[in-house]
């Protein structure tokens, strides 16, 4: 038995499942073909991340609405990166009445948060990234309805190897606890 963990984008997970180069994927929500099946592992809140000395940081200790970020420059993933969170954050911003001005783009979360710490803008990411302790930034819960991000386990409907099936059962059983 051999398990290989590889970090790839949500788009790459979907493509790998389709072309059968991977058997099981873990990803953020993204439009998927009918040949794939999804099990939601968890759903977590989104957080706005900004410099600790940002004016909104002190005003928003109990959370922040997306509309408060309308005039802020955003640091985010490139549209072409294939991250499932991209469309969700843009949708939340549009629902709040604005289109984010993305002034800096990076493909890695550590870089995005580092650029925020350098004062180049704000970002919105899943709350699990709070674990990345970077000096000079604060994390504020986004209060808008629907400001959560799911993590999916995804696989092909039509076939599963015994190992993929065992892995899926292990993950889903542990999540159900």
Give the ranges of each region predicted by the language model:
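Short loop/turn segments at beta->alpha junctions
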Residues: 9, 65, 107-108, 126
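Short secondary-structure boundary segments
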Residues: 29-30, 52, 79, 127-128, ...
């Amino acid at each position: 038995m051999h398990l290989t963990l590889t970090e790839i984008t949500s788009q790459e997970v979907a493509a790998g499942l389709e072309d059968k180069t991977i058997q099981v994927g873990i990803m953020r929500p993204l439009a998927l073909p009918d040949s794939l099946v999804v099990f939601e592992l968890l759903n977590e809140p989104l957080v706005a991340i900004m410099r600790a000395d940002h004016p909104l940081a002190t005003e928003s200790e109990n959370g922040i609405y997306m509309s408060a970020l309308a005039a802020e420059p955003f640091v985010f993933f490139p549209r072409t990166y294939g991250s499932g969170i991209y469309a969700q954050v843009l949708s939340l911003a549009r629902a709040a009445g604005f289109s984010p001005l993305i002034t800096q783009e990076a493909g890695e979360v550590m870089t995005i948060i580092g650029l925020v710490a350098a004062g180049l803008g704000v970002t919105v990411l899943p709350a699990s990234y709070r674990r990345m302790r970077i000096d000079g930034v604060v994390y504020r819960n986004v209060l808008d309805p629907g400001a959560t991000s799911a993590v999916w386990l995804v696989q092909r409907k039509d076939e599963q190897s015994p190992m993929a099936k065992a892995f899926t059962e292990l993950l889903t059983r542990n999540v159900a606890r």
